[in-house]
């Protein structure tokens, strides 16, 4: 790619988005995927895997704050957290802000992602890889949750879209392993795409998760990079009350955690579980 070239995302067959490229910082075909980082004048550094944008410097905080603080503050007493994926380090950064957490395990299939993100996206991890509570495991996520004897309070699946290496993280085998790897009252959350364009994926995840969890739903956030509408995050737990916490309880936990966020707040937390009717209808009829 030349410095003035346009980079086109290939997630959808018939339409998409493009980015102007100021400078290509890194490109490599790793053992598992084709990876590129380039600079864009609006979004800063952009990372893409297999032709699909994964994260940008400009708006990554929305995604990572919602993926971490919603389940962690809903739980309230999490000590052990498992991150599946998350090689750019931003999920780890947000989890590590919770000082009551004692252990953070991250399972990443591709060691190359971790290495180049530390070099080319340093603001994502912001030093979190040096946190003494952190443990990195290079392994397939499905294999890990089905082999480990450890139990976790919160599991965060920072998966790619269900193509290529990320496809296995949308299977029943993975969801069953996650359910088994949670402590009592534990919470599982996962990236589940833009529901207007990827509605079938949301329905499929909902149906599969419902076999292993008593309370399955989604929450949402608007993230500019992921075009097409709101992004949905799968939510699954055995405790139905955790999704219905009142704003006063969340506000108290937020203050006690000493968090300062750019997107997340307790009101956003409560409102994020309100879903558009077209998704609710799909979840009801496509079973």
UniProtKB/Swiss-Prot annotation:
GO CC annotation: cytosol
Start and end residues of each PABS domain: 5-238
Signal peptide: none
Enzyme Commission code: 2.5.1.16
One GO process term, biological-process aspect: spermidine biosynthetic process
Protein location: Cytoplasm
Alphabetical list of NCBIfam families matching this protein: MFS_SpdSyn, PRK00811.1, speE
Functional description taken from the UniProt entry: Catalyzes the irreversible transfer of a propylamine group from the amino donor S-adenosylmethioninamine (decarboxy-AdoMet) to putrescine (1,4-diaminobutane) to yield spermidine.
Catalytic-site annotation from UniProt: 158
Disulphide bridges, residue numbers: none
Domain of life: Bacteria
Catalysis performed (reactions): S-adenosyl 3-(methylsulfanyl)propylamine + putrescine = S-methyl-5'-thioadenosine + spermidine + H(+)
Protein name listed in UniProt: Polyamine aminopropyltransferase
Complex formation: Homodimer or homotetramer.
Keyword annotations of the record: Cytoplasm, Polyamine biosynthesis, Spermidine biosynthesis, Transferase
Binding site for spermidine: 64, 88, 158-161
Family note: Belongs to the spermidine/spermine synthase family.
Amino-acid positions noted as binding S-methyl-5'-thioadenosine in the UniProt annotation, renumbered to this chain: 33, 108, 140-141, 165
Lineage summary: Bacteria, Pseudomonadati, Pseudomonadota, Gammaproteobacteria, Enterobacterales
Pathway: Amine and polyamine biosynthesis; spermidine biosynthesis; spermidine from putrescine: step 1/1
InterPro entries for this protein: PABS, PABS_CS, SAM-dependent_MTases_sf, Spermi_synthase, Spermidine_synt_N, Spermidine_synt_N_sf
One term of GO molecular function: spermidine synthase activity
């Amino acid at each position: 790619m030349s410095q003035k070239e346009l980079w086109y995302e290939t997630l959808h067959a018939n339409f998409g988005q493009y980015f102007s490229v100021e400078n290509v910082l890194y490109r490599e075909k790793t053992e598992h995927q084709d990876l590129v980082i380039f600079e864009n004048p609006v979004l800063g550094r952009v990372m893409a895997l297999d032709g699909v944008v994964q994260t940008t410097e400009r708006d990554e905080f929305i995604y990572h704050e919602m993926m971490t603080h919603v389940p962690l503050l809903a739980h309230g007493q999490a000590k052990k957290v498992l991150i599946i994926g998350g090689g750019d380090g931003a999920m780890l950064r947000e989890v590590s802000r919770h000082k009551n957490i004692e252990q953070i395990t991250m399972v990443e299939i591709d060691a190359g992602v971790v290495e180049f993100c530390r070099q080319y996206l340093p603001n994502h991890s912001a030093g979190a890889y040096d946190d003494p509570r952190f443990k990195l495991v290079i392994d397939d996520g499905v294999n890990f949750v089905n082999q480990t004897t450890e139990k976790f309070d919160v599991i965060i699946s920072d998966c790619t879209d269900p193509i290529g290496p990320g496809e296995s993280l949308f299977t029943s085998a993975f969801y069953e392993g996650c359910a088994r790897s949670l402590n009592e009252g534990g919470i599982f959350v996962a990236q589940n795409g833009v529901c207007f364009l990827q509605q079938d994926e949301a329905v499929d995840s909902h149906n599969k998760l419902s076999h292993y969890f008593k309370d399955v739903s989604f929450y949402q956030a608007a993230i500019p990079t992921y075009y097409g509408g709101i992004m949905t995050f799968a939510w699954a737990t055995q405790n139905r009350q955790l999704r219905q916490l009142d704003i006063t309880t969340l506000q108290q936990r937020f203050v006690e955690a000493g968090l300062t966020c750019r997107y997340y707040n307790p009101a956003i937390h409560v409102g994020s579980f309100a879903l558009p009717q077209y998704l609710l209808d799909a979840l009801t009829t496509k079973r």
